[in-house]
């Protein structure tokens, strides 16, 4: 009997794996040949198996898309002639025309359009090739697409509410903006953050771009539009240090230079807190009232003093000698929420919360009989004095004047100054606090920390952190240097609200004494103390600005750009070196609304470098066209 032996002659499995391997090699060869323009090899392979024309790689790209990525116009024409589908979409929803537009390949776009490519197919971000064309410096590509586009496509909004006009202003493209407006683009449309194209133009710092939008027949009507945080174009220009743009905006009769944001801060408050002396001077020359107070009862001079901006203090002190500015309320006796490295700025812009006192006051008011109204009002006065200042001690015992900030519900009323109303005997009304808006300080836009909203219910309600829109959150997520910071500071939005630290803030003294100390080179406030990882304020020497923090403070991360990258395939190998880069960092002012932030929404908008690289700093874009 023969011994059983293994028969290696049966090679069906081997042949099957060999066939699969050769098929993979063939596809790789096809993609490589398409990218390199190897027409002969590509033709021979496709003739053997025409179905290869519709084969897709892991990113959903066909050989035609690879030919577009390699800018091989002859290969594109050959593949189309052999029957390739010109409107196939990849894994990101992009067609071959969309890819060619992202790459700024004018010749390829013309060839695809002549062969029947559709220009109205949006990708998964809702963007048309028209959106992508705004990132290309050559305006001819946009002109070619505009010739094929309808008015609805010109005003098409992507998933972030951005129209091609928004993107043109975002990319600082005056010629593109002019062409879009000429073809019927609507400048009154707002994105999800209620920003118009004029907001983006002002943040770019380009006077020519701003003048193009303002010269449109609808331009003056949007000059007072405020975004979701209540900031108008003048606020943005003041915070960014664009004094020349402020002067241009002021020439429009409809411009309101004293518009109030959600924290009742004027552009002068922002310019003073940011240390923009040129903007402070421009606003004062334009007749801006330097004695207006925000929700914290602080004037622009108080912010300039606290931040140590000597030049701004000199300008504002000459204007406000008639009514001295009161220093910020002392916060020595109350615990403060841990805010990471931004705690110093939160002392400037966040209202000190007195929830323990209010809860105690509520319990006392409920326990007392209704006949003791006079005693209840006295408690309210005492609490109000400890929260705001000592200015109300001279008020009559039966009422206290409080500032009631009305909700801005119409275009005519949202810019009115706060009205004074007497307090009814119903207890202390809730103190509205907002999250810290970032200010341009020391060449960086500092990300805002969130403040808690105080509620006047029976119990001290839970703190609700402000929700930022997806677009506003992305303005803080795409950081270039996400490492190198202490663990406790990696995500200041998720800090433990129960963790507190003691701090020493301003000593209550008159504004004149503070001015004398500042000009005499003496320290104007006490040193801010906190945990070792927090920044410290040191006593300023003569002529030094208080904005300089401790040399041992953590390095402030460069602010990322705010918008989703228009690069079509940021991770695809065959587009290495080719992805389109957005190149402006917007001086972002995040949302301050009191909603719960969604961690799932902290998605990145792209992987592009900050646009501040071309703008000369992370705080403001450049004047490319100046």
From Swiss-Prot:
Residues 616-626 have a biased composition (Polar residues). Residues 354-372, 604-614 have a biased composition (Basic and acidic residues). Residues 354-377, 455-491, 522-626 are annotated as: Disordered. Pfam families: Ank, Ank_2. The modification Phosphoserine is found at residue 474. Coiled coil: none annotated. ANK repeats lie at residues 25-54, 59-88, 92-124, 125-156, 160-189, 193-222, 229-259, 263-292, 296-325. The keyword Repeat applies. InterPro entries: Ankyrin_rpt, Ankyrin_rpt-contain_sf. Disulfide bonds: none annotated. The keyword Phosphoprotein applies. PANTHER family: ANKYRIN REPEAT AND PROTEIN KINASE DOMAIN-CONTAINING PROTEIN, ANKYRIN REPEAT DOMAIN 55. This is Ankyrin repeat domain-containing protein 55.
């Amino acid at each position: 009997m023969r011994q059983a032996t293994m028969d290696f002659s049966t090679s069906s499995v081997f042949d099957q794996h060999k066939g699969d391997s050769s098929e993979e090699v063939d596809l790789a060869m096809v993609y490589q040949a398409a990218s390199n323009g190897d027409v002969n090899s590509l033709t021979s392979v496709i003739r053997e198996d025409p179905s290869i024309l519709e084969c897709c790689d892991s990113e959903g790209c066909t050989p035609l898309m690879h030919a577009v990525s390699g800018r091989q116009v002859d290969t594109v024409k050959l593949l189309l002639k052999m029957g390739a589908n010109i409107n196939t979409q990849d894994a990101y929803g992009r067609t071959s025309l969309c890819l060619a537009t992202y790459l700024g390949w004018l010749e390829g776009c013309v060839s695809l359009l002549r062969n029947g490519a559709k220009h109205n197919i949006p990708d998964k971000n809702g963007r048309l090739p028209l959106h992508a064309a705004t990132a290309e410096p050559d305006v001819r590509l946009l002109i070619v697409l505009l010739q094929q586009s309808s008015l609805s496509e010109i005003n098409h909004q992507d998933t972030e509410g951005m129209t091609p006009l928004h993107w043109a202003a975002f990319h600082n493209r005056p010629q593109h903006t002019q062409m879009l407006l000429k073809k019927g683009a609507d400048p009154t449309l707002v994105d999800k953050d209620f920003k118009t194209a004029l907001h983006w133009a002002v943040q770019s710092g380009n006077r020519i771009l701003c003048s193009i939008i303002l010269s449109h027949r609808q331009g003056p009507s949007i000059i007072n539009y405020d975004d979701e945080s209540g900031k108008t174009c003048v606020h943005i220009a003041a915070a960014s240090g664009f004094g020349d743009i402020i002067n241009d905006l002021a020439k429009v009769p409809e411009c309101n230079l004293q518009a109030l944001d959600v924290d009742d801060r004027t552009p002068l408050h922002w310019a003073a807190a940011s240390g923009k002396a040129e903007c402070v001077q421009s606003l004062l020359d334009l007749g801006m009232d330097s004695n207006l107070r925000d929700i914290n009862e602080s004037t622009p001079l108080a912010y300039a003093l606290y931040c140590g901006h000597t030049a701004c203090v000199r300008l504002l002190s000459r204007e406000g000698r008639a009514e001295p500015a009161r220093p910020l309320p002392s916060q020595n006796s109350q615990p403060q929420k841990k805010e990471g490295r931004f705690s110093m700025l939160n002392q400037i812009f966040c209202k000190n919360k007195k929830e323990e006192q209010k809860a105690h006051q509520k319990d006392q008011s409920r326990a007392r009989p209704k006949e003791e109204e006079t005693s209840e009002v006295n408690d309210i006065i005492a609490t109000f004095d400890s929260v705001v200042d000592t200015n109300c001690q001279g008020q009559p015992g039966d009422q206290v004047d409080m500032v009631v900030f009305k909700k801005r519900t119409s275009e005519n009323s949202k810019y009115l100054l706060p009205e004074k109303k007497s307090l009814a005997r119903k207890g202390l009304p809730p103190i509205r606090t907002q999250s810290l808006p970032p200010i341009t300080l020391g060449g960086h836009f500092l990300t805002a920390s969130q403040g808690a909203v105080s509620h006047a219910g029976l119990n001290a309600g839970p703190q609700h952190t402000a929700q930022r829109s997806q677009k506003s959150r992305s303005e803080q997520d795409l950081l270039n240097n996400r490492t190198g910071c202490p663990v406790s500071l990696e995500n200041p939005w998720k800090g433990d609200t129960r963790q507190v630290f003691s701090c020493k803030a301003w000593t209550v003294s008159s504004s004149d004494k503070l001015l004398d100390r500042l000009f005499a080179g003496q320290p104007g406030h006490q040193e801010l103390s906190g945990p070792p990882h927090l920044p410290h304020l040191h006593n300023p020497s003569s002529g030094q600005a208080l904005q300089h923090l401790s040399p041992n403070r953590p390095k402030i991360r460069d602010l990322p750009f705010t918008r989703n990258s228009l690069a079509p395939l940021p991770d695809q190998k065959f587009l290495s070196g080719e992805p389109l880069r957005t190149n402006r960092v917007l001086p972002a002012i995040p949302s301050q609304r009191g909603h719960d932030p969604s961690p799932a929404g902290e998605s990145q908008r792209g992987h592009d470098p900050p646009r501040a690289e071309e703008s000369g700093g992370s705080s403001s874009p450049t004047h490319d066209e100046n």
